[in-house]
Design a protein with these regions (language model features):
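Structured binding/interaction patches within domain cores
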Residues: 1-153
């Protein structure tokens, strides 16, 4: 399993040598999400969201909406609304960023179930869709991600 601090340190060292290239950041975010997704389970991520969260009501609402959507109790639009509320909780503090990453990974499981990734698509397609959706909600995400990496250096 990958250690988040080791990954962040490696990225920070590279950034110091390469002028904080935004394209590099997005690629590193993609690689990080892929590793995080592959090395965790949906249940594990759900537990992390509960354990490391100051905004339990909004997170719980999102997690319940996710489960209810798959039980056909709510619409996809309702699920998306709850997801967006949870994503908007993001701040660039270390604790906030880790919480945000857990929400993103949990969303990847949702996207996979929603079959948003095209038939025959792979995890890279799934991550690309999430990064685009995140950018719509947080246009400054690359800058905030960069700031987080610098703080961890």
């Amino acid at each position: 399993m990958y250690d988040i601090n080791e990954i962040m340190n490696n990225i920070s060292e590279f950034l110091e040598k390469n002028q904080k290239n935004k394209i590099f950041l997005i690629n590193k975010l993609r690689d990080f999400l892929k590793k995080f997704y592959e090395n965790n389970s949906q249940i594990n991520i759900k537990e992390k969201i509960f354990l490391n969260n100051k905004n339990t009501d909004i997170s719980l609402s999102f997690l319940l909406a996710s489960e209810n959507y798959y039980n056909s109790s709510i619409s996809l639009n309702s699920l998306i609304s709850k997801r967006v509320q949870a994503w908007k909780l993001f701040d660039s503090s270390s604790e906030g960023f880790r919480f945000f990453l857990n929400l993103i990974i949990y969303t990847m499981y949702d996207y996979e179930k929603e079959e948003i990734a095209k038939e025959g698509g792979d995890i890279d397609d799934l991550i690309s869709i999430i990064i685009i959706d995140l950018h719509d909600i947080h246009p400054s995400l690359p800058t905030q991600f960069e700031e987080f990496l610098i703080q961890q250096a």
